[in-house]
Amino acid sequence: MGLRLERMTAATAAALLADQRPSDIEVAADYPTEFSKGVATQVATGGELGPYVIHSPTESLVVGEIGGAFTGEGTVEIGYAIVESHRGRGLATEAVRELLRRIAPRTDVERVVAHTPLDRPESARVVEKAGFAFVREVEDTHEGEVLRVKEWEFLTKAG
């Protein structure tokens, strides 16, 4: 069985927002990720772009999340996170590739963007291995904090 993306449920989102462990899925011991709460707020507005929980291909555990949202006409920004105990196994790259496969048939997406923190080169490696090209360094805001990040893009067939 390979890595699996499954839409985050309202029950999982509610638990995360209440600082509780989800009871409707089995999760890694160090779940949630640093982005779980932010992702959980997107469940009510979620569509084909997620958010999704990431299931380990070797264990019956959720080990992270991934999703995307339109940031402009034809442009989707994606974000992803894997719990520390499961990093370095290629799971984030595989999840990004799977999300790109799901986006591929869409005619309304021309460009997929990802921002990776300068202090997390492994995150940049994820999108690079998934086929993204480096665009430039930019300032991004995360939870009210301005960060310097690398911007990456993946051009779809529609683009």
Question: Where are the language model's segments positioned?
Answer:
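A generic structural signal for short
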Residues: 71, 88, 111-112
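GNAT-family acyltransferases
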Residues: 1-77, 81-85, 98-106, 119, ...
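Conserved beta-strand-loop-alpha-helix junction that forms the acyl-donor binding cleft
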Residues: 114-124
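Glycine-rich acyl-CoA binding loop
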Residues: 90-93
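Conserved active-site tyrosine of GNAT-family acetyltransferases
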Residues: 127
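Conserved GNAT acetyl-CoA-binding A-motif
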Residues: 106-115
